[in-house]
Amino acid sequence: MKIKFNPLFKDELTIQEIQVHMENGEITSKELVMYYLFQIANYDQDGPKINSILEINPDAIFIAEALDHERKTKGVRGPLHGIPVFLKDNIETNDSMHTSAGTLALATNMSHNDAFLVEKLRKAGAVILGKTNMTELSNGMSSEMWAGYSARGGQVRNPYGDADLFVGGSSSGSAVAVAANFTVLSVGTETDASILSPATQNSVVGIKPTVGLISRKGIIPFTYSQDTAGPFARTVTDAAILLGALTGIDSSDPATYKSEGRAQSDYSSCLDPNGLKGARIGVFNPIPNDSDEYDEQLFRDVIRTLDKEGAMVIEKIDIPSFHREWSWGVSLYELKHSLDNYLSKLPPQLPVHSISELIQFNKGIREKALKYGQDKLEKREQFPNTLRNAEYLNAKLEDVYFSQEQGIDFALKKYGLDAILFPAYIGSTICAKAGYPSIAIPAGYMKSGRPFGVTFAGSAFSEGVLIKLGYAFEQATMHRKSPILS
């Protein structure tokens, strides 16, 4: 006998719709969690085997029941009360789930602490539903590794196409879980394109915040300079709600100190359907027409929409440093330093406590762990862990100077812009090196059915402006379509 679910669940419910239904007694958080588990069983782990989910929280139903009871007896904590959320597998939780970053070496790693952002989610009343699959070590393993693959979890598939359709990464599972309606929300992380790429490839909204808006504490690191967590959702409204819940000053993360007085705990005031009217948006488009991720007609449609909605569109803007030959010294040296430090603090019973030990562990189970090799790890093994050498320091200084003063800030000031529009996620690198925010928005589908998206980018702590622009564009177009899972 099949389980019968509330017919309301057939639709992709938003946070606001769920809260209304819960207040009216039409659905419960427990029922919602059970429905998503059913979807995961039948479409993620069976059927088309999307494979976006790496681990399920065994306490999820209990947590949802407790929050349902609290709603009846004490009231609602806020908009996330009883709302299911998935976390990327590099975000620590103090529960019965593991935190492995997709590696087999850390498959038994259980944290004794919640990441700061997880503490925030629990206090807001969210139900942590589980962990999502990801590109192993946030794409720090191999130059040959396909986006969305991990030795522990296998390959994440794009729900909009066949197995060969690019899924984007490294927060692949987090984006796909939202796109395929296995959850309402998810949290990913980005160093460079890891939120923006899978968001555009899977037709969801992704926000890569200013570095420091969300605490990095409790996240398996890639760099110090560029790492940040950020939300995925099917609508800008839901992404904005989740973003506000994740912000806050963390005494354990100095990067968050600069957000004091600049971060918001509620971005709902930015959700203006007329937000494009009078906005000055610069268009940067250096993509060749033969790129698989670019569609000239769809991008021109975006520009026409901006113009129609009252924006002042300045095309072919100049960003002086965009095409410079960037040094990758920051990611090379900082991954060695940050990951070695993280591994060194792990409990003694775990098999690895350094990058060198991780490399040797993988070699010992080569057939399981090294489908794509580990050349990126091996390259970093010999790097020093002092962050004092000239190559690294000069790379760090150049990244900041050329991405900010001679990059994003230069263009914003020169043209008097509120934001810069990029097709797909081509602006990810310069924004990542600057530590500046971007928002990815669905912008239609190619003739093949492949999703197309655009990103709006701005200066530090301009998330409110970007949400305003993204929301107005979304409401004017309503491009997103649900994938067909069978």
Task: Enumerate the predicted regions with their spans.
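Short glycine/serine-rich loop segments
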Residues: 113-250, 423, 433-455
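Short, well-ordered beta-strand elements within core beta-sheets of diverse protein domains
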Residues: 18-24, 105-109, 227-234, 456-457
